[in-house]
Amino acid sequence: MVTPVCNSSTWQPKDSSFLSWPEMFSLDSFRKDRTQHRQRQCKLPPPRLPPMCVNPAPGGTITRASRDLLKEFPQPKNLLNSVIGRALGISHAKDKLVYVHTNGPKKKKVTLHIKWPKSVEVEGYGSKKIDAERQAAAAACQLFKGWGLLGPRNELFDAAKYRVLADRFGSPADSWWRPEPTMPPTSWRQLNPENIRPGGPAGLSRSLGREEEEDEEEELEEGTIDVTEFLSMTQQDSHNPLRDSRGGSFEMTDDDSAIRALTQFPLPKNLLAKVIQIATSSSTAKNLMQFHTVGTKTKLATLTLLWPCPMTFVAKGRRKAEAENKAAALACKKLKSLGLVDRNNEPLTHAMYNLASLRELGETQRRPCTIQVPEPILRKIEAFLSHYPVDSSWISPELRLQSDDILPLGKDSGPLSDPITGKPYMPLSEAEEVRLSQSLLELWRRRGPIWQEAPQLPVDPHRDTILSAIEQHPVVVISGDTGCGKTTRIPQLLLERYVTEGRGARCNVIITQPRRISAVSVAQRVSHELGPSLRRNVGFQVRLESKPPARGGALLFCTVGILLRKLQSNPSLEGVSHVIVDEVHERDVNTDFLLILLKGLQRLNPALRLVLMSATGDNERFSRYFGGCPVIKVPGFMYPVKEHYLEDILAKLGKHQYPHRHRHHESEDECALDLDLVTDLVLHIDARGEPGGILCFLPGWQEIKGVQQRLQEALGMHESKYLILPVHSNIPMMDQKAIFQQPPLGVRKIVLATNIAETSITVNDIVHVVDSGLHKEERYDLKTKVSCLETVWVSRANVIQRRGRAGRCQSGFAYHLFPRSRLEKMVPFQVPEILRTPLENLVLQAKIHMPEKTAVEFLSKAVDSPNIKAVDEAVILLQEIGVLDQREYLTTLGQRLAHISTDPRLAKAIVLAAIFRCLHPLLVVVSCLTRDPFSSSLQNRAEVDKVKALLSHDSGSDHLAFVRAVAGWEEVLRWQDRTSRENYLEENLLYAPSLRFIHGLIKQFSENIYEAFLVGKPSDCTLPSAQCNEYSEEEELVKGVLMAGLYPNLIQVRQGKVTRQGKFKPNSVTYRTKSGNILLHKSTINREATRLRSRWLTYFMAVKSNGSVFVRDSSQVHPLAVLLLTDGDVHIRDDGRRATISLSDSDLLRLEGDSRTVRLLREFRRALGRMVERSLRSELAALPLSVQQEHGQLLALLAELLRGPCGSFDMRKTADD
């Protein structure tokens, strides 16, 4: 066991049991500090404003019923901030909007000082500060609207128009944001010029543009940095004004000097108060700034200033105020000479006044964490290394071995796989082909022609044209309008042509669909139309579910991902006659990747025919991509659909103006869906609309659950008369199929779906379509290297597709929750996914299919080539995690990962878990990161977070909470007690369909691991007694292996931060990654943890939201796990007695110990690397018994090391900041 200690003292074990733990890293003081800071109120005297105050009513304030104002301006602070920010080209308007608070006996008063476009003040009242602020801000919004700074619907103008409007007030906008020179010491404005400007009482007024309550988390502020980063930005300024200050008495006999000082500092008392309050974090300066005035005709004022050190200033005047102002001005002059006031005569930031404390804390942060390994464990490590020495010439391979030495693994070296059946491929003999073709012809004759038994579709008259084009050309594009029948009919037409010509056995068609539900439902529809005799010739294959057709005369419907997997084991698609790529216009990343492979496949298999089918889109572009192939256009048929837009809908609902969110859309293009409006519309349709199903398109799962809950609450006891069906990729296929079922008589079907229901599937009884106009799109930020799943407007092509869902089988109605003007602004087609998402998976797939080409070369052949920089970033990441070598060839690790169908980092974690013998919990974690097991919604997030915290116990891990949740579910399933199962799900807020899906994923990953030669048989993966699960109960090892897979996704918790206002908060924490600071999302249990066992966290994914980067899942990891299990080299500094060891590629981990301990840990790390290398180079289960025993001893030592305490994070309890 080991004890890392992060201060000068070290922890000594009391006895051999090592059961005592050091003091945990406590966050209690941080929470208390934050609360106390918000409870204080700044009582500075209000700044003296020019006499340009607006007095529209007697009394000098703008008065109007707050209820009416807030109804017109529901988010007034955001609106004010947006107007000024846009007009001045700044991101924050704090120095243009100053809120001054006054406590009344019953209500709080706020005076809002507005400094742009001219100086004016308004007042607001409320029981809370935030209410008073909002009322004042709403009054200011009314004033802005009267000045013409807001449109009739409170919409914003562009920046150019604001500059013109500002000129009318005599305050050109440009003059307000031109950078101003400042003097050393470096101010926060210099450190973050885009966010902060000097001139305001830093930290005294709340951030504008936020409507939250007083307890809003301060960590959410943009621009917050940790102490180390702040000091590195100010290191060029060695001047510490507080150290240079000296006390003294200044008897002023020369009144001219005082007059000149007063001219330089016209409001000296205010300035002194602000400086002292900011520097000392106090709400008043009275105790540190005291006046004593004597005299009758001539007043003599003595100012005693106790900060930064005792100083006295004396001045005279005819009146008391004059004398005191002169003394204060002299004090201001002295402070400026000490560097305590900037060149604009404004206070410095709180951080700059506390540089000494910052530097002291920074020095503490830079000290390495001291580790002590108990002597018994050190002796065991020495004995192991003596018995199994690591060759001195052996260097950590970083899992990046040159591919020249790699043993071929997997199916690529074996027989081809039949793409239709999945069995080993063997061509049919001539006799078998004749016999099978004759049998198919007899079955077909009994059935009769398609058009005699199935309803006539618009595509049927074009039958000969389509079939002739496919016969004569290797590639054909079919552009068919919605409802033409291309998806179900063209595969049957191909099969009919081949069968009736006596060559049916040669017809083997693979039809790809973009989604699982489409592949299954279309296969079932075609199977039904072909009839009982030919039903076995139609099949489907999707993730976790497969029903392949019989060989010869086969139609296989599958997802694009399934076909990509088939191409790995049969690169030329031998045995396939046609590939039909349906819905190619959607331009998902897998389809674009598939087109690259299919284009190259034409040389390998010239007989293969490729058909691209699209409902909408730039079909000529596909034609040019395939060398000018023919495009056949097929008109569709739709019943009439009556369309309603937002303005029509609001009129029907009796609402006479846009909801605020929709007004905001018009000005800011932001996409926030009003779930209440959606619910009201569905209820209105139900009450007054035609009978029939309602299909509602929503952006994502949270919106689906939100609308579902609102409908259930509104329907109450009448819910039995409605069938409310959510449709989302999170829901297993067996549950999604319910949307195709006809509801009982008198029951209305309401389908709540994402764009999963937009194409390929037809729900016959849908009459009404509610279109939110929104969907989720993944976008990748090259600068932050973070993905963001954003809600964005759909394209016009999407709107057409959604509208078409209402007119497939009867006349219908489409309700668009956006104005007609928005439709005109929508882009014609979606941006291809390949241009806006991370490319690691795609690059890995490229290296599997065409290893001889570089990633850039391969992806440059796409219909739309991605940004070269994005491709290079993906290659670098894969090299960092050891999947590719420097020549872009797959490493041994990369070859193993190629078998596992998930994100490369998660796949790496699975591979390492098999080697480190803790496989099952990692399979659960990876499955749960793919599909969330909890039944979370907008309404119950807090409850879900509490359940996760309980499930995690004291592990400090969201990921182990997943493991315990699934383990509990598996245990309940064994009881076969329905009541127990339901109680378990309800108590732990788990979603049964997701748990079933997770179970399927674990089964699939088990097959993948078997294919990668990591286990002897798939069932071993979940068997507790199997060798691959020997250490599955060792939680620190499990978390460490997960971290090794996810590395460099590592966080170091650091003490102290500097806010964007320049406020130094020594008792707060920041979360530092290799690429910068991030925030912990409320959904991770470590966000609200009061004690952390370790300063180091690992995470899978960071997401960007509102300009900040958040981590949603995290696990505390042992510092020795970080040292021993990560890739890359380590760096050691050894003076012969003490040594430090750190990661060469990161400054997030530095450990210190005696030279012997550090040397042994380095050798132990190399032994672990050797174990991984050996395991990757051969079948894991086939390793010699002696090697397996060696690995077993090594892992036993590692588990013992990690059972020890993770170390304490000794926090200095400073005064409240």
Curated annotation (Swiss-Prot):
Domain Helicase ATP-binding: 467-635
E.C. number: 3.6.4.13
Sequence motif: DEAH box, positions: 582-585
Main location: cytoplasm
Region (Disordered): 176-223
Domain Helicase C-terminal: 677-850
Chain residues that bind ATP: G480, D481, T482, G483, C484, G485, K486, T487
GO CC term (a single one): mitochondrion
Gene Ontology biological process terms in this record: central nervous system development; mitochondrial large ribosomal subunit assembly
Keyword Lipoprotein: no
Subcellular location, record wording: Cytoplasm; Mitochondrion; Mitochondrion matrix, Mitochondrion nucleoid
Expressed in which tissues: Expressed in the heart, brain, spleen, lung, liver, skeletal muscle, kidney, and testis. Expression is strongest in the testis and brain, while the lowest levels of expression are found in the spleen and lung.
Residue intervals of the DRBM domain: 76-144
One Pfam family hit: DEAD
Family recorded in the similarity comment: Belongs to the DEAD box helicase family. DEAH subfamily.
Reported function: RNA-dependent helicase. Plays an important role in the assembly of the mitochondrial large ribosomal subunit. Required for optimal function of the zinc-finger antiviral protein ZC3HAV1. Associates with mitochondrial DNA. Involved in nervous system development and differentiation through its involvement in the up-regulation of a number of genes which are required for neurogenesis, including GSC, NCAM1, neurogenin, and NEUROD.
Protein's UniProt name: ATP-dependent RNA helicase DHX30
